[in-house]
């Protein structure tokens, strides 16, 4: 910006000094504009021999200036308009702001559509996109233990907050469902309008307040739009059908009825007046076992929940984005030790729950022995000498399975078919409960892990041993040994913009903070 000012002849040189000397003579706008032009011509050497190229941006044709200015970030254009009147005039060209809207926010709307609504690209950029840029990205709503996943995106001439809902239980491989909860747009050059999308009576007035960095809240101003003529009973049936894909007649288990009714009552008390906290897509590294990201998984009577898989050296963490009254959102539901691979027996032995249990408990016992040895050495005040200590556990030599390709890696056929060397046959042991029997019948790798279980209200939480099973790039599973239960996780295919963490430290801090949001 300082360079632009110097090129224009209105920087901290003779132009500015002369202008300061005239301050006592009054402020005539037309006279000031003429003086700006005179100063630029003087400093460009108008009386001298015509230079080979312009020494001032003001001598460039307007269309060239429009092209130059449209390449600058929109946040810099406000200061550029203060340099001189010619710049101020050129910056009223909507072409500049159309390019900024497209390049910075992906808005590709036709200008004719804008003209019909009486809104300029400058208005869209300044009053909508720039003003609400801080709420774009991924967020977790504060809904007690239930959490959620909100994605705020620019959609045409709107900013829309989409709530992601898992597919109906137990169809974990189906696509996510999306539900709009609010939208922001411009109406006839006025300020941006915020509307609540909750309920079945159409958009209605709402407010958005940016509480602090990485946190904002919404407040519906017309909650009567959320009510239905049939009262709470009709609202409950509608919510049950739309959000869970169920009817009252489908639910026979009394405990499940209680869980569903409890969730409905809890959600209704907020009336779409919620606080949201920013979350990030997990960072990826070439050595990761599979690409990190968001998955939906089966959690018994609690239905399908959204989780986030992330890698931290030789540890993989599965964190709940949505939760339940036992283990709330934000908690680390599964932790996998990638230095503890487990070789599965043949299918016949794998069907025996005791055999699989022995494999897992043997690894747990080894971990406890190593931990006791480390503790004893610390108590004795001596380090582990190289001749006395057991060999340190090394990470799995290759976290990504070898020769991984699109054809040979996802063999779900019968055990009679010949499988690539890195693929093992898999079947659930007898007695292990699964919400979805359509799980893969082959896997790539297995590791020892622990799962978090707790009583109602997150009481008496404890980590219990289990088996992490990598099926393919988009699916993994976990056997909860103590619960005799199996969870299947399938990758969310959705693409998320503006969701990357600014740094690895910021992501780690977010993970730590998430655990305190719901406890």
Swiss-Prot record:
GO molecular function: ubiquitin-like ligase-substrate adaptor activity
Key words of the record: Cell cycle, Cytoplasm, DNA damage, Metal-binding, Ubl conjugation pathway, Zinc
Residues where Zn(2+) binds: 196, 204, 220, 226
Chain positions covered by the region annotation Disordered: 11-37, 369-424
Composition bias type Basic and acidic residues, residue spans: 369-390
Residue span, F-box domain: 54-100
Keyword Membrane carried by entry: no
Cellular component terms (Gene Ontology): cytoplasm; SCF ubiquitin ligase complex
A GO biological process held by the record: DNA damage response
Highest taxon in the source lineage: Eukaryota
Pathway(s): Protein modification; protein ubiquitination
Database matches in Pfam families: Cyclin_D1_bind, F-box-like
Subcellular locations according to the entry: Cytoplasm
Domain notes: Zinc-binding is required for the structure of the protein and facilitate folding.
Cited function: Substrate-recognition component of the SCF(FBXO31) protein ligase complex, which specifically mediates the ubiquitination of proteins amidated at their C-terminus in response to oxidative stress, leading to their degradation by the proteasome. Fbxo31 specifically recognizes and binds C-terminal peptides bearing an amide: C-terminal amidation in response to oxidative stress takes place following protein fragmentation.
Family: Belongs to the FBXO31 family.
Assembly, per entry: Part of a SCF (SKP1-cullin-F-box) protein ligase complex SCF(FBXO31).
Protein name: F-box only protein 31-A
Biological source species: Xenopus laevis (African clawed frog)
